[in-house]
Amino acid sequence: EVIPVRSFNYRQFAVADYHRDHPEQPIIGTEMGSTVTTRGIYEKDTVRGYVPDQDITAPWWASTAETWWTLAATNDFWLGGFVWTGMDYRGEPTPYQWPNINSHFGIMDMCGFPKNIYYYYQSWWTDKDVLHISPHWNFREKGPGWNKPVGDSIDVWVNTNADNVELFLNGKSKGKKDMSRNSHLKWTVNYEPGTLEAVAYKKGKKLTKKIQTTGLPVEVVVTPYKTTILADGKDATVLNLTVLDREGREVPDADNMIQFEMEGPGEIIGVGNGDPSSHEPDKCPEGAWQRRLFNGKCQVIIQAGTKPGMIKFNAKATGLWNGGTDIQTISPESVAAINIDK
């Protein structure tokens, strides 16, 4: 009773008994979650060390996101909690060891690409309209994430803070469901290529979300976080790379090897793709930078040099149209002068 607030690291199953014995003492989750997921993977794979990208797997001492957050959100004696972790990190490979090189605990992967539990938390921690469907809807005979013959049953998850959702597969309704707060919705449907669409209503406002079976990749796309950085030898920008099919749709299961080239006053200082079992180097010899897409995504970090100018970045893959972007580096002195003028 000396402690004004009791903290729990996991062990959410013990909270009810503790609260019964200490009904006036507030509780905070100082370390919660440790849900394990692999971005873009929808079948357990013990050989490659992947777990499904759904809120269903946790070590015995931890919990799913929905389990701990529902407990915290629905009890007044809970002050909230801290999630382990925001992002995957090197070490602590759980629940597998080799060939894993990092954890699966993150709401996002090592590159900051969201996993599906990102949208669960976003649904209940923000006022933003959220409507998210998973899994993706691609079938490949040999894909990195998921193999399903036509007709096989698939659990389709929808994360949302809308009041209700109706799910359609190729225009045919699979049923309408009401959304319980702090939860998610799930339909079991038989796979067929095409379009999955969720139609939701939130306080009378209509929300829609579609995912489609894509074609094969034809084009590399580069999306920079910043297109202007300081020429101070320290500032950097992150470039996210994806590939599109002929209809301009992002291909979520692509695994193309992407090569990177750049010229100008800066350098590539690292690459990644969020794959917890990738043994590719994060740093490459000059002129040999490359990274394979992991479930459709990879990343490059460019750091500025000390001279102002234009960095020209190019990304290419065999058989695909190149992608690229320009990054302007500007002197810190010019920025300081602008700030003084203001």
Describe the predicted segments one by one.
Residues Y191-T195, A236, P308-M310:
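Extracellular Ig-like/FN3 beta-sandwich strand-entry sites
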Residues I154-N159, V199, K234-P252, I258, ...:
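Beta-strand-rich structural segments
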Residues K186-Y191, P285-T306:
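Short, hydrophobic beta-strand segments
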Residues E1-M179, K186-K205:
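Extended substrate-binding grooves/exosites of carbohydrate-active enzymes
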Residues G204-L216, W321-P332:
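Edge beta-strands of extracellular beta-sandwich domains
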Residues I211-K234, E333-K342:
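Low-complexity, Pro/Ser/Thr- and charge-rich linker/hinge segments at domain boundaries
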Residues V218-V221, E261-E280, E333-N339:
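Short aromatic-acidic-glycine turn motif
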